[in-house]
Amino acid sequence: MSCLAALTKFHEIYKAAFVERLGELPRCFTHGRPSPCLADDALAGSEEPQPWQMVPRREVAVFNNVSHAMDIELHHDIDDFYGHLFGGPLQFDSPWGEGELIQIWNEDDFVLLQQNILGHLMMKKQLKQPQTWFVGLIGDVDEMVSVNNADGTVWREVAGQEPHEQLAESLEAFLQQLKPRVAPPQYHQEPAATVNPHPGIFASLKRMWQNLTGR
């Protein structure tokens, strides 16, 4: 099974868990942002959490611009994980605790993601640490779930530090160990002076970026 197949399967299991437990699709706060994955009866401008479901992209999105800017070859799993689907945040339970996978809400989300991954890679280079890129958060202190770009292994990582605990041999293997966490959507209040939050990234990137930059 590929990373994309494992991610698609988790989306399907995630949706089924919400339908079985709550009788409805997963919901998230949209912050007024449209998305292809909003359900037909969803209201993007509503302040209430709206139902969503995974939608395949018509064209695969890639990270060639980030690779070119850093003059490195990014591990192919990054395109599998981020480039094929639109979706909301995926909350999970795992052998290592609760967490959240970052997913792409809309095209603006993808641009923001590229900027944040580029910033993360630049920070790792500056610190002379192994190159990693993130796929989510885990634990109570917003540790990152990151992928070692050299070999595709999945790690637990604190922003600005080297990865400190290997979680899986691959992103595919990591995804297969997750279980959907059926829980109410979380609302992250953003300071008025910051950029509007993107629900697909669900404020996770902003928290990580603040950790990386100290702002």
Swiss-Prot record:
Keyword field contains tRNA processing: no
Topological type in the membrane: Peripheral membrane protein
One GO CC term on file: cytoplasmic side of plasma membrane
Broad class of the protein's primary localization: membrane
Keyword vocabulary terms for this entry: Cell inner membrane, Cell membrane, Membrane
Transmembrane residue ranges: none
Family: Belongs to the Syd family.
Protein name according to UniProt: Protein Syd
Organism: Shewanella amazonensis (strain ATCC BAA-1098 / SB2B)
Gene name in the database record: syd
